[in-house]
């Protein structure tokens, strides 16, 4: 574990040092103590009422059987709050979400985040994937040569979450296609709301096959054909 973290943080530090000086946080959310307190103050009951306007796409409890719609049940509340805030500010783009969140207040977003994080996480519907050496290495050790830290060092073991990092997403059992689309969007720069460009700088080193393998590894489903990049902003 210590070796994994050492590799992860060494690579992350190198990435930060290599990034242009003007590449500050790409998100409108600054994790001050006040922001964290607000994001964690959400009321799930109020969030459930607000969710009624979201249920057509995201299902009754935040999970829906549509490949490119993300599952929200059991997701980190701070991550959800950040994404909603970024959609509203325009630092994350989506033809649907940018309009959908414009009437939400900061407290509304905290309430929705509390509701979704309190729901049951999605369950994998496919057969478990066979272990993939490339995915396991990237997830647990990383690749120091390419300055790629272990994914699990930030996202938790098997992507189950890491409360030590504010706003860190849960990857475990999320849809393979959605994970693939998001990694591809970070790689191309189409998605640019990662703080200090960390995900973009990591993903630019990943091959198509590595992205597919990581998506399969965390979703615990067999690899699927890579989706078209044009769906990445959903």
Task: State what each model feature region is.
Residues 63-64, 90, 118-133, 138-145, ...:
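Inter-heme linker and motif-flanking segments adjacent to c-type heme-binding CXXCH motifs
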Residues 47, 54-61, 112, 148-157, ...:
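The canonical Cys-X-X-Cys-His
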């Amino acid at each position: 574990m210590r070796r994994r973290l050492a590799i992860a943080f060494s690579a992350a530090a190198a990435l930060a040092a290599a990034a242009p000086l003007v590449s500050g946080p790409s998100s409108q959310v600054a994790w001050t103590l006040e922001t964290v307190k607000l994001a964690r103050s959400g009321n799930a009951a109020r969030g459930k009422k607000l969710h009624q306007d979201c249920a057509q796409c995201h299902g009754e409890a935040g999970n829906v059987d549509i490949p490119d719609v993300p599952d929200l049940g059991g997701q980190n509340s701070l991550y959800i709050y950040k994404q909603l805030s970024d959609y509203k500010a325009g630092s994350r783009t989506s033809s649907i979400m940018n309009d959908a969140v414009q009437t939400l207040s900061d407290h509304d977003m905290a309430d929705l985040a509390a509701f979704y994080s309190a729901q049951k996480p999605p369950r994998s519907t496919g057969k478990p994937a066979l272990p993939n050496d490339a995915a396991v290495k990237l997830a647990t050790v990383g690749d120091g040569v390419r300055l790629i830290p272990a994914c699990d060092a930030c996202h938790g073991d098997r992507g189950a979450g890491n409360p030590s990092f504010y706003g860190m997403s849960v990857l475990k059992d999320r849809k393979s296609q959605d994970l693939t689309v998001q990694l591809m969007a970070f790689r191309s720069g189409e998605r640019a709301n990662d703080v200090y460009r960390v995900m973009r700088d990591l993903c630019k080193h990943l091959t198509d096959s590595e992205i597919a393998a990581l998506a399969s590894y965390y979703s615990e489903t067999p690899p699927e054909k890579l989706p078209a990049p044009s769906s990445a902003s959903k």
